[in-house]
């Protein structure tokens, strides 16, 4: 018989930097999860990632207070900011351009994000990422709108 799910928690935590402090502690504490056990397993699972990379995680909590978690790929906006070398997107993306990314950088990001996007086609994934870039005020070189 399958375990009974009592809740799912979605958090964005920097890789290798999970700690019992907010937002992790209170979110897990509400469901009675062993916080230190999660922190240790999350930090171990993100050991290969660059420290500080924001990683979305979906934690499934069961009735016996056990849990499982799934690591997602970093948000497209985070990857685009890294590629363009900027701190934040434009406040007015239509008028203000804050950085540039090439078609090759868009392809790399699309390949990373592929498993979380709702497409199997790399070209469609590139268009999704390019749209995110445009909405952040990042200019995309070599890719038609």
From Swiss-Prot:
InterPro entries: Ribosomal_uL11 (IPR000911), Ribosomal_uL11_bac-typ (IPR006519), Ribosomal_uL11_C (IPR020783), Ribosomal_uL11_C_sf (IPR036769), Ribosomal_uL11_CS (IPR020785), Ribosomal_uL11_N (IPR020784), Ribosomal_uL11_N_sf (IPR036796). GO terms for cellular component: cytosolic large ribosomal subunit. SMART domains: RL11 (SM00649). One or more lysine residues are methylated. GO terms for biological process: translation. One of its GO terms (molecular function) is large ribosomal subunit rRNA binding. Keywords: Methylation, Ribonucleoprotein, Ribosomal protein, RNA-binding, rRNA-binding. Part of the ribosomal stalk of the 50S ribosomal subunit. Interacts with L10 and the large rRNA to form the base of the stalk. L10 forms an elongated spine to which L12 dimers bind in a sequential fashion forming a multimeric L10(L12)X complex. Forms part of the ribosomal stalk which helps the ribosome interact with GTP-bound translation factors. This is Large ribosomal subunit protein uL11. It comes from Persephonella marina (strain DSM 14350 / EX-H1).
């Amino acid at each position: 018989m399958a375990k009974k799910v009592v809740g799912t928690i979605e958090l964005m935590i920097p890789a290798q930097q999970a700690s019992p402090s907010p937002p992790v502690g209170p979110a897990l504490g509400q469901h009675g999860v062993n916080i230190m056990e999660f922190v240790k397993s999350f930090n171990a699972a993100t050991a290969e990632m660059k420290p500080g990379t924001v990683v979305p995680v979906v934690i499934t909590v069961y009735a016996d207070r056990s849990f499982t978690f799934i690591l997602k790929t970093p948000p497209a906006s985070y990857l685009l900011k890294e590629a363009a070398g900027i701190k934040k997107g434009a406040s007015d993306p239509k008028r203000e351009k804050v950085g540039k990314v090439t078609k090759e950088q868009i392809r790399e990001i699309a390949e990373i994000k592929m498993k979380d996007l709702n497409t199997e086609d790399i070209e469609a994934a590139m268009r999704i990422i390019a749209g995110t870039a445009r909405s952040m005020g990042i200019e995309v070189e070599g890719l038609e709108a």
